[in-house]
Regions:
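Catalytic histidine neighborhood in serine/cysteine hydrolases
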Residues: 181, 185-204
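Flexible "cap/lid" loop of the alpha/beta hydrolase fold
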Residues: 63-64, 68-105, 109-112
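Acidic beta-to-alpha connecting loop that harbors the catalytic carboxylate
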Residues: 1, 174-176, 201-203
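Short beta-strand/loop motif that positions the catalytic acidic residue
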Residues: 164, 170-172, 176
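Catalytic histidine-centered segment of alpha/beta-hydrolase-like enzymes
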Residues: 202-215
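Conserved HGGG/HGGXW glycine-rich cap/lid loop of the alpha/beta-hydrolase fold
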Residues: 1-35, 46
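Conserved alpha/beta-hydrolase catalytic His-Asp/Glu region
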Residues: 86-87, 104-163
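Gly/Ala-rich beta-loop-alpha elbow adjacent to hydrolase catalytic centers
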Residues: 50-54, 58
């Protein structure tokens, strides 16, 4: 659902690096997304950063081709599978409810509901919030449906974490309501030698909400 706009501040700050933003089209599997990103990336070793669902794609890239992933940054993301039982059913109902809104009222109407939990409360109904809505509106209902399918079928990466040996940054907003700090603390504990950065005054859309802090963390990570 996110496009190049989510990384625009970092692309400017990292202008000395070859920064590319992967696209997933109508792919409905995180593994297929990871394979496409690997196939379309330049040959050789890569510094892979992923935000939200993209963090899960980054983990899949590392699982599929660990020899190609030189370092990894996981932003505002998760590593667990869909919960069993009632929690999983609630997540399904929530996501399918959003999809129904997108189909009946359009992507922007859906985004206006969904994105209210994505940013720090003080950024609601601000130009930044509108830019998030603009970005989500650029996606199609079919893309949204495909990404829901991918996320509901997500793999539990817990067993993968101890084997990750590349320099890894784990970053989230202190007020991320979608992927909370405790979730990122668990992710950081699972990856030996990884660094945890919690960005103050920041929700889920860290790259857009606190671009300077995120860019600074990425520059430190690239220097490792």
């Amino acid at each position: 659902m996110c496009d190049e706009a989510v990384w625009a501040p970092q692309a400017a700050a990292l202008a000395g690096h070859d920064c590319r933003v992967a696209t997933h089209g109508l792919l409905d599997s995180l593994t297929l997304m990871a394979r496409k990103a690997l196939d379309e990336a330049p040959p050789g070793r890569l510094s892979v950063a992923g935000h939200s669902m993209g963090g899960r794609v980054a983990l899949e890239m590392q699982r599929l081709a660990p020899e190609r992933v030189e370092r990894m940054a996981l932003l505002d993301t998760g590593f667990a599978a869909l919960p069993a039982g009632e929690a999983g059913e609630r997540e399904k109902a929530f996501r399918f409810g959003l999809l129904a809104t997108a189909k009946s009222r359009g992507m922007r109407a859906m985004a206006a509901d969904w994105a209210r939990g994505m940013v720090h409360p003080r950024r609601l109904d601000t130009p930044l919030f509108e830019s998030v809505l603009d970005m989500l509106e650029r996606s199609s209902v079919m893309q949204f449906e495909a990404q829901i399918a991918a996320l509901l079928a997500r793999r539990d990466a817990s067993a993968q974490l101890p084997g990750i040996g590349c320099p890894t940054l784990v970053l989230c907003g202190a007020q991320d309501g979608w992927a909370n700090v405790a979730q990122h603390e668990a992710l950081q504990r699972g990856i030996a030698g990884s660094e945890l950065v919690v960005v103050p005054d920041c929700g889920h859309m860290s790259t857009m909400e606190q671009p300077e802090a995120v860019s600074a963390a990425l520059l430190r990570w690239l220097a490792r």
